[in-house]
Amino acid sequence: DGKLDYDRLTGFTAEGEAELAAQMGPVGAEGSVAVPDLVADTATYLGYLKGEGLNVSGVVDLAKYYTIETETVDVDKLLSDVFFLIVPEENVEGRTYLTRTSSGGFDLNRDNSFQTQAETQNMTQLIAAWNPVSFTEFHGRVKQFQCEPCDPPHEPNFEYDLLAEHLMAGGEALGIAAVANNDGYNSYVIPQRDYLSYTGAKAADGADQTCWYDPWDDMSTSYTPQYAMLHGTVAYTVEVPAYNDDVAAAVAYGQLGQSAYIAENKQEYLLAQTKIFERGVTNANSDAYELVGQWFCDQYDVEGAEAELFRPEYDGAGQNGNFYPECYIIPLDGANQSNLQAAADMMEWLSRNDVKILVSETAFSYSGVRYPAGTMVVSLYQAKRSVANGALYDGTVITGWPVLYSEGITAFAKTRGFDMVTCAEPAAYRTIRAACGDWMDHADCVRYLANVTSSFTGVEGAKVILSNASEDSTAAVNALLQAGKGVGMILSGEQAGSFLCDYSDWRSVCTQYRLSGAGVAEADAPLSLTITKAPVVYISGKPSDSRTGFVKTSLVSGSYQYNYDRQAMELLGFQVTDDASLATLVIGAAALDEAGLAAVENGAAYIGYGSNAISAITGYTDRRGNQIPGCLLSTGSLVRETVSSESMDALAYVTYPTQSLITASYVSEGDELLYGYGAGYFSAIPEGAQVLIRLDGAREPLEGFLVGGGEHYDDFLDNSIQAISYQKDGLNLALFANTLTNKLHQRDEFNFISNMAFSSLLGGVY
């Protein structure tokens, strides 16, 4: 008859209230569950109670503890109130082959901000186009049956106070219906509701102190629901407890209950999302405590305690006093933009994510620089300002929390390596806006980018200095070398680390890639050495085929580091081999394997980065307590430390104390920033090693998660060694304490790998 019935928990019985108090524990007692002030008025705790003796979701005597009503949903009316976008499976190949990862070897639920994979590009574009008021994604497995909203810390680009109007109630609507309509899993948890604990101590004001000991946070927008929240969407990840018929019923009824709640409150949902967009269009300041500010609590749940950390305001002379600037200026001309490829890619990324783009039609000046017509301007006066700012802002350095679920890095200008200027002065923005044309959507930007091509200045018909600044520049050099063309690497001067080629060869690649070139007469060409041949790269850590089931399961499932490296090499245009004996360069974030080790010992150059690669060299203790010896270097000569076991990453200023072609292009470009996942450094290096990179202890990092109480926190920040080179006993090594290819996002670090590849083929060490 077009109607669906489901049971809904509506309240607690007397026994239920007593059991709730017992399971939450005495107020103020160490380990008891505390009710967060910010959700005390919206959280009902219906569905919280676990079965006797259980700490996971299981069977509960619902009738004993809850009052229950049967709700009837008229499906036709529901569909007249709301419509549904249903994506049965984002990861089609993963579903086919029973792997969490995609065929590319990526966890797609860590790629929604970076959007390096086709699957996430498609999903995020769908969200951006439809602007759903609510989004729910089902995952597994968390045996407690977990439904969001997340606990803090929260991503600062969320307009969280408006999202919070329905986050808790919508999450509970799903959880309540799910657990009340299946036979096996009758309780669920919500991080924001259930994960705050009493410490047993008193706060300074005499109140019982509380603490988020193990946050399930939404600081990272790499997860699909958290990405959706940037679009004003009330969004959830649901972590089911198992894969079986009971859970299938729970998911179906959970969605029904949540859908009924959304239909009942659809005008309020639409109004809240409209207010989010209104804040964007007016670039309103929503930092106040009573708005977003209160949601930036510290680890001890003091509301607003970290508002200034998470939402610092532009408070200089003439600036807007807002967390959001007025606009970002991204040049698209060769004089002002060192990385044309990444800048053009950013225009496509932003517009694909429903950020509207402006392009100047006349020249304008800002902060003493004249920008020509054709300069990209990303205005924050638009509905999707949170999406734009979430991608382009520098980020937050978090030190006061014990753990995060994933790194929060975006900072595209820094991690992808293009030049960008931030404007926070309203008066200057008005001048910039007046120079621009109409707003451009994705289709407009794609058409426009067809005419954003390589930049060339100077003498034609002689030599060309090809700037070493991007994946495209590396791929172009590889294309020339693989075609048998001569390419030199510049050894010194302002262009050290860039390339020298013939003008005719430049012409053969400048239309295929977005490059920057400067023509010079042969007599004026800078000193260079010819790269003797095209590099051949061996990537350490490729697993053998699986013996049963899908033969590539071992490759695509769990071999994250290998797949990051593999896709990075594809972007850079390197020839990759599975026969290490043919390699001129061995690379890897994974541990150096047997074949790679043999190649390095026989003369191939090696660049290793991150904890696994370095541990294979230094030696380590395995899970069983066995001491595994290192390789290449003598025991104890290289020591890698980390800030703490839970620390993750840093985008930090660095110095380059040693002249080397491995770092030369960064020095020439004035690139003083290094991103690395791992929060590591070298506390001891082998005799004869050269320090390539140190952290700049005089400057604060821009972004990162570094536990302030970590054993080596101060050591890490105190000019710590981040990278070394070592040429001795026939070895040619470059070793980095942290990652260079993590999740394919940190592309500004790719050139360390390519510089090693090319410089090792110059006939000496440079």
Model-identified regions with their sequence ranges:
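Aromatic/His-enriched, Gly/Pro-containing loop or helix-boundary segments
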Residues: 21, 49, 108-121
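Short, solvent-exposed loop/turn and secondary-structure capping segments
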Residues: 96-102, 120, 139, 145-151, ...
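Active-site neighborhood of divalent metal-dependent phosphoester/pyrophosphate hydrolases
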Residues: 91-93
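Acidic/histidine-rich helix-loop elements
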Residues: 105
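Extended hydrophobic secondary-structure segments that form protein cores and membrane-embedded regions
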Residues: 83-89
